[in-house]
């Protein structure tokens, strides 16, 4: 399975619509690179992870959207999400949850608008740093 190709199929048209560039980080992670931010989508045995990358003063920061969502979501917001068996279903479920949890802020993220109250910075791997920083700096 090629995770990059799967995401490319799922989000066909997003690159042009939101002026983003889909970039492969590794076999299990891709990023949509915008003008001064990137939205990472990772795949693991635990499911799909969503990350927000921001370049401030030449320092790349990474934030887990999952951690923010888990704190903010209620049982009602998760209602109607069916168990997923394919990458497509998993990503779509995450995006539905993201839309509900952030009151449609996912679309804002795709346009480069930031969410407030980030306090959960995560470790940025060297691979993420080199690929995403290069992508952000060349835009």
Predicted regions and their residues:
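Intrinsically disordered, low-complexity regulatory regions enriched in serine/threonine/proline
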Residues: 1-10, 22-139
């Amino acid at each position: 399975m090629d995770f990059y190709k799967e995401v490319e199929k799922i989000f066909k048209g997003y690159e042009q619509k939101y002026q983003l560039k889909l970039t492969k980080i590794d076999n299990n992670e891709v990023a949509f690179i915008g003008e001064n931010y990137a939205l990472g989508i990772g795949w693991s045995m635990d499911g799909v992870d969503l990350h927000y990358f921001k370049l401030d003063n030449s320092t790349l920061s990474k934030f887990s959207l999952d951690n923010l969502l888990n704190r903010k979501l209620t049982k009602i917001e998760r209602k109607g999400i069916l168990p997923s068996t394919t990458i497509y279903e998993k990503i779509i479920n995450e995006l539905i949850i993201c839309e509900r949890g952030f009151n449609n802020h996912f679309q804002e993220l795709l346009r480069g608008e930031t969410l407030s109250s980030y306090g959960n910075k995560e470790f940025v791997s060297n691979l993420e740093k080199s690929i995403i920083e290069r992508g952000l700096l060349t835009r």
